Amino acid sequence: MRTSPRRPLILKRRRLPLPVQNAPSETSEEEAKRSPAQPEPAPAQASQEVAESSSCKFPAGIKIINHPTTPNTQVVAIPSNADIQSIITALTAKGKESGTSGPNRFILISSGGPSSHPSQPQAHSSRDSKRAEVITETLGPKPAAKGVPVPKPPGAPPRQRQESYAGGEAAGCTLDNSLTNIQWLGKMSSDGLGPCSVKQELEEKENCHLEQNRVKVEEPSGVSTSWQDSVSERPPYSYMAMIQFAINSTERKRMTLKDIYTWIEDHFPYFKHIAKPGWKNSIRHNLSLHDMFVRETSANGKVSFWTIHPSANRHLTLDQVFKPLEPGSPQSPEHLESQQKRPNPELHRNVTIKTEIPLGARRKMKPLLPRVSSYLEPIQFPVNQSLVLQPSVKVPFRLAASLMSSELARHSKRVRIAPKVLLSSEGIAPLPATEPPKEEKPLLGGEGLLPLLPIQSIKEEEMQPEEDIAHLERPIKVESPPLEEWPSPCASLKEELSNSWEDSSCSPTPKPKKSYCGLKSPTRCVSEMLVTKRREKREVSRSRRKQHLQPPCLDEPDLFFPEDSSTFRPAVELLAESSEPAPHLSCPQEEGGPFKTPIKETLPVSSTPSKSVLSRDPESWRLTPPAKVGGLDFSPVRTPQGAFGLLPDSLGLMELNTTPLKSGPLFDSPRELLNSEPFDLASDPFGSPPPPHVEGPKPGSPELQIPSLSANRSLTEGLVLDTMNDSLSKILLDISFPGLEEDPLGPDNINWSQFIPELR
């Protein structure tokens, strides 16, 4: 302890009695100076009892919710008009009061109040995030657990600053006397401390030193012999200037190297007693570096002299630069010129001291404890309170989606893949694993073109033996119409979806080839289906890259349709019967072998095997496909039976999403919208049941898809207040609400034009 002079000093300072009487007025005064528009903190913050009881005296709009996954963590939703400093103080007192048994980590998020304009809560949210940034930046190494930030007015004397520090600590919480809590180190300054018996002489020396510096700044004329008489202070001149002083002090304006050393040591005692011997190397370096110093040799060639080149010699002497002046006389021009040309480092140091000491909060220290960086923390609120959080526009949807998908992939075995939407009106489609068959004429003439039918959605339900034989005898070729004829209702999302989702498995579609393939016998189909299902279960466990690189099927299947259109059942019944064995459309490989890759739907977007998507009502199908009793189900994601009703979709968009994550229904009310967890339409981890029936969007309304993308991924910024290690971190929160009573996030109340530029 004795070898380190600072540690006993700091320990002694730490145990000083801290005056609290002026703390409330100081705090409110400084708060008024910092931001006159914000409400002043209550004077009752100065006492610990009020701070402890303020945990139940939060403003009306604050809601505290237990975090569903992290223990001892609570989420605090703060309205935009609340006083953040008093809330942080109350939360700190609450965390200190509960200790390790109760909640000691709080996530602060901003929630907008009731507003008639949709853009106004967004302004509140951005203002709150800016205020949170101000708090984190102002605190520096002293986190928010110690209470409010205490910026100092520039003219505050040291004693007032010490009292304001003490007031901030007393208002925040009870002082922690533990030696492991070193957050208060950043608040210590070298002056303005109370009496200390152990290190009294050291503090007096520091204070005298500061007073000397202030005198030198304010009265340069009275500084005549301070540094010259002082051994411990380095002279404020460069080596080049001191060499000029030494050479010009002689009559012949020349001097040997040894004489230069001697002259500097005589006139500047610092170099003789304090400085390390390396300063002589600096002298030699400057002599050889600058061209103004010329080396001359004596007549006999034994002695070398250093002189100054006549054209560069300004005849500077120490008497010109450093001359004792009378206390009221003006300074000489040489003195002013030298002071301007060679700035005094002592003066600069004093100026910085005078600016930094009053502004103690601006002093930056490297944090001694590790700090938590920004991260995404998924939160699902299992409550029925009407809690409105403003989504942050600062976080792009694509970045958050990629971060969230990587987080899910890292923590679970079931990988959720983002839904991929087919591009329209450009003729560019992802490369299918099996090329689509062609159709030369519509099956039902006069009813229009056949929509794009997925192969696995064609179910064989009831086929008469006569029709079976007739269709086996004459195969029919099916041609998918060109992509230009099928407009997409999400044309506004075309560019960003193509940028974010077509990187993995997208390339121009090659020309489909014609091929012929017949249906096998039922027993052969059942055996092939079982073999293929086992093989596909093994292949699902592999990576997507290996599936993508697998060679496609050599022969393409043809589609067979019955002549009557009476066999149609809803997709929910077909999904319920998907576990029964049934004949299946198969593609023989090398004359009869089972195929390796499952038959994809028409124009698949990825190489991941997928199950059939939802079918449509008879009016939009224009013909009834023969539904088979059961089909291969390769999807790693199980769709809940009866989760969705039939989606009226006459544009064929739902059949083009072939990833395991189905393009779910687009909701009309926020309860249905918020019941769906981001990237998980199939399961609700908190047990909220899915809606029994959900209406789909009307065709040609692209705005209804943007709420489903952005409101499901409502990202907001928050702060994490950890009262155990006194840290305040800024995080991004991924929030979804399963149980909202009101309808604040509906499409009518939210201006979705704020989210469209961020998506692009």
Swiss-Prot record:
GO terms for molecular function: DNA binding; DNA-binding transcription factor activity; transcription cis-regulatory region binding. The keyword Endoplasmic reticulum does not apply. This is Forkhead box protein M1. Keywords: Activator, Cell cycle, DNA damage, DNA repair, DNA-binding, Isopeptide bond, Nucleus, Phosphoprotein, Transcription, Transcription regulation, Ubl conjugation. Transcription factor regulating the expression of cell cycle genes essential for DNA replication and mitosis. Plays a role in the control of cell proliferation. Also plays a role in DNA break repair, participating in the DNA damage checkpoint response. Promotes transcription of PHB2. InterPro entries: FH_FOXM1, Fork_head_dom, FOXM1, TF_fork_head_CS_1, TF_fork_head_CS_2, WH-like_DNA-bd_sf, WH_DNA-bd_sf. Residues 1-54, 95-167, 323-348, 500-560, 577-635, 660-709 are annotated as: Disordered. Phosphorylated in M (mitotic) phase. Phosphorylation by the checkpoint kinase CHEK2 in response to DNA damage increases the FOXM1 protein stability probably stimulating the transcription of genes involved in DNA repair. Phosphorylated by CDK1 in late S and G2 phases, creating docking sites for the POLO box domains of PLK1. Subsequently, PLK1 binds and phosphorylates FOXM1, leading to activation of transcriptional activity and subsequent enhanced expression of key mitotic regulators. Phosphorylated by GSK3B leading to ubiquitination and proteasomal degradation. There is a cross-link at residues 199, 323, 354, 420, 438 (Glycyl lysine isopeptide (Lys-Gly) (interchain with G-Cter in SUMO2)). One of its GO terms (cellular component) is nucleus. It comes from Mus musculus (Mouse). The lineage of its organism: Eukaryota, Metazoa, Chordata, Craniata, Vertebrata. Residues 43-54, 110-124, 140-149 have a biased composition (Low complexity). CDD domains: FH_FOXM (cd20029).
